[in-house]
Design a protein with these regions (language model features):
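Extended substrate-binding grooves/exosites of carbohydrate-active enzymes
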Residues: 1-207, 214-219, 223-233
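Short, solvent-exposed loop/linker segments at the N-terminal edge
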Residues: 175-180, 257-266
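Beta-strand-rich structural segments
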Residues: 185-189, 227, 263-281, 287, ...
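Edge beta-strands of extracellular beta-sandwich domains
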Residues: 232-244, 346-354
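Low-complexity, acidic Ser/Thr/Pro/Gly-rich terminal tails and inter-domain linkers that flank the onset
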Residues: 243-261
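Short aromatic-acidic-glycine turn motif
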Residues: 247-251, 289-306
Length: 355
């Protein structure tokens, strides 16, 4: 069995191998290499070697010499919809259009089409520390960020690999200043078809044919909703509501009781929300955390690849509206409390029973 790392992503590479060794099987051991930063979107394609070269690529083969070896990823729009993201060169787009050689979608289509190719192990699953140039602490290869928050690509693979009906909509629907401008809306699903609504008005349905579904929509604030349909019935939905100014926080814990002295980790995901409880996807508020009772703070993170703060500090700046707090129980029993505070934000408390 032959394994292919990055060069296995290039046009014709796997076919060349199979032509010369038709009796051998292969596995894509480090394929595909694609980038995403959670909550970041660009409508025009990014190629690493051209747009954000790795240290080992600088001064090496230039883009003009390399571009014939990559699988095309068309721009979603003629002009960039999110030019403000150019202020953040270390963040990559979540439209599955930031890559080294091939998109995640094309890579899986290719894997399915070659019976002698046993599968692929994408690089990587989680963002990880290292292999990053200052001021980054990690690369953006993962489909889950370094705070263990899923990115949009996570749901792409869910649509490909699961049978439970699902639909995932991107991007979020809070784009102040872009009223009337065209926004690419992408949907991942495993349903027969998806119908899209803006403010309860249908924009029509599209059949699922194994590819992502794309609408180009003039932005208007309000509600965007995707409804997944199977056998004529709605079986899955996803929606976003346009957010107003940050007002409070929402706390969601993976557990609300834990045994005393346990090595279990309590993971609390925090969203900045507006006065109506709608998540604010651009919020970057600084939050402080106070832990009382039989609990202790293990660490905090926000998924930002360029933040270098100590993990054990009792405060954190949210990244794209989110952050995560990790707690653990002490030896004593009782009620533990996490208090979350932020400037001009409503304070919130979360109680954990230590039993």
């Amino acid at each position: 069995i032959i394994g292919f790392n990055g060069n296995g992503e290039e046009i014709g590479e796997l076919e060349y191998f199979h032509k010369n060794y038709p009796t051998l099987c292969a596995i894509a051991t480090e394929v595909p290499h694609t980038y995403q930063t959670r909550g970041v979107y660009r409508s025009q394609t990014q190629w690493r070697r051209r747009d954000f070269p790795a240290p080992w690529e600088k001064g090496n083969i230039n883009w003009e010499q390399f571009k014939h070896r990559v699988f095309p990823i068309p721009d979603l729009t003629e002009k960039e919809c999110f030019p403000e993201e150019s202020d953040y060169p270390y963040y990559q787009s979540s439209y599955d259009n930031a890559s080294v050689r091939i998109s995640a979608r094309k890579s899986w289509q290719r894997t399915c089409s070659f019976p002698w190719l046993m599968g692929e192990f994408r690089w990587g699953s989680f963002d990880y520390l290292g292999e990053a140039e200052w001021p980054q602490r990690c690369g953006n290869f993962g489909i889950i960020d370094i705070a263990a928050i899923p990115k949009d690509a996570y749901f792409l693979y869910q649509s490909l690999w699961t049978d439970k009906p699902m639909v995932h909509l991107l991007p979020h629907w809070t784009h102040p200043g872009k009223e009337g401008k065209t926004i690419p809306v992408v949907i991942y699903t495993n349903c027969d078809a998806v119908e899209l609504f803006i403010n309860n008005v249908s924009l029509g349905s599209k059949p699922y044919t194994g590819e992502q579904l794309i609408w180009l929509i003039p932005y208007s604030p309000g509600k965007i909703e995707a409804r997944g349909i199977k056998k004529g019935k709605i079986v899955a939905t996803d929606c976003y509501q346009s957010a107003e100014a940050p007002h409070s926080v929402a706390l969601a814990s993976n557990k609300y009781s834990v045994k005393a002295g346990s090595d279990e980790v309590i993971r609390i995901e925090i969203d900045i929300t507006d006065k109506n409880g709608i998540p604010c996807p651009y919020a970057s508020n600084e939050l402080s955390f106070h832990v009382s009772g039989p609990l202790r703070l293990l660490g905090v993170d926000n998924g930002n690849p360029t933040d270098m703060f100590p993990y054990q500090q009792p405060h954190c700046r949210c990244f794209r509206g989110k952050c995560v707090v990790l707690l653990q129980s002490d030896e004593e029993k009782g009620k533990g409390t996490l208090t979350v505070q932020g400037t001009k934000l409503v304070e919130k408390k979360l109680i954990i029973e230590v039993i």
